[in-house]
């Protein structure tokens, strides 16, 4: 392997000649061969947005020459294009401030910027610390990049997937509004409900999650940049944080602002905890929806079989013809993983000892993973399951007509105890509810027909 020699304050080190990173990245790569979880590229892009904005701000404040500013902006734009992804090899499991990833970005930006300056016949050169990292610390850059990445992924991935599934459920809700089925509570028969009403509950869960997500993501717009090492802003111009937030906003289209309290921004990540709490709530709702769907589709001959779902692949390696609710199973596993991630994010956020939380990479990793899993899970579940949900009306009608809980409609006319006697007699003697009611003498056939109307029971008001 061809190498070149790079150096840092620890001395010289060999770096692969075809890679753009420098000495500190190479040391981290060697010192932390832990796991396979790479630092998400979206965090790198968040850093690139930040370094780009910092160069513009430092130029405005007289801290950086125009040539250096242009070179850094060019390098950051190259990173944002996705063409340099291979030059960011570090894993999540590194220093808790994310210093190695900050330096990885600084070194790659410096390398590309120097090539740019050389191509433009400039005598200037870019240093990863003195120029790319000017007015910054890893302690305020990593949380800034984290917030930029999280907000963007919620906006571009999670919310569209949530809306997609929500809209599909709304279509099913409206389509099945005339189908009356038996309701169930405690896994036991209950009073009737429309299939559309049942699905409306699922849909409204997603409506509420969409509202909560919209609210919680607002707090992610606060950026730590400008706090530098411990929140005091040492080595940064007083206007630096505001200017960087402004430039990031202009380039992303999102209204980021500089946090009003940098001490909080460095040592606490409660905004991310709140955001992930919303992700956990969404995961819980998706778990419920997926479980309901697979129970209602259970069968085909010895289950509930009130709805059918798409058959996407063989379900068993030994039982021919078996088809399983695989999309539901996928979504419930996604939900479990997100719930576990929430525990990690909550505990990690609590570890802000003194002026700095040093669990930032794992907070970032778990939150982004939850966003990706939920977004992909909802989209896949929607396209391969939800859109194909159809009622099996023969079974639905059969369960409804056999239900003893229709007796509830007699309560206002004959009282709870007599109605209970009718239901128990029907169950014990294998009678229909109508047969039992007439045999007890509590109601006539005409009264039963007038009072037991499922269509009235699902819309009593």
From Swiss-Prot:
GO terms for molecular function: fumarate hydratase activity. GO terms for biological process: fumarate metabolic process; malate metabolic process; tricarboxylic acid cycle. It is found in: Cytoplasm. It catalyses: (S)-malate = fumarate + H2O. Substrate binds at residues 97-99, 127-130, 137-139, 185, 317, 322-324. PROSITE patterns: FUMARATE_LYASES. The record marks 329 as: Important for catalytic activity. Its EC number is 4.2.1.2. InterPro entries: Fum_hydII, Fumarase/histidase_N, Fumarase_C_C, Fumarate_lyase_CS, Fumarate_lyase_fam, Fumarate_lyase_N, L-Aspartase-like. Pathway: Carbohydrate metabolism; tricarboxylic acid cycle; (S)-malate from fumarate: step 1/1. Transmembrane segments: none annotated. Pfam families: FumaraseC_C, Lyase_1. GO terms for cellular component: cytoplasm. Keywords: Cytoplasm, Lyase, Tricarboxylic acid cycle. The active site is at 186 (proton donor/acceptor), 316. It is an enzyme of class 4 (lyase). PANTHER family: ASPARTATEAMMONIA/ARGININOSUCCINATE/ADENYLOSUCCINATE LYASE, FUMARATE HYDRATASE, MITOCHONDRIAL. Involved in the TCA cycle. Catalyzes the stereospecific interconversion of fumarate to L-malate. Belongs to the class-II fumarase/aspartase family. Fumarase subfamily. Homotetramer. There are 2 substrate-binding sites: the catalytic A site, and the non-catalytic B site that may play a role in the transfer of substrate or product between the active site and the solvent. Alternatively, the B site may bind allosteric effectors. This is Fumarate hydratase class II.
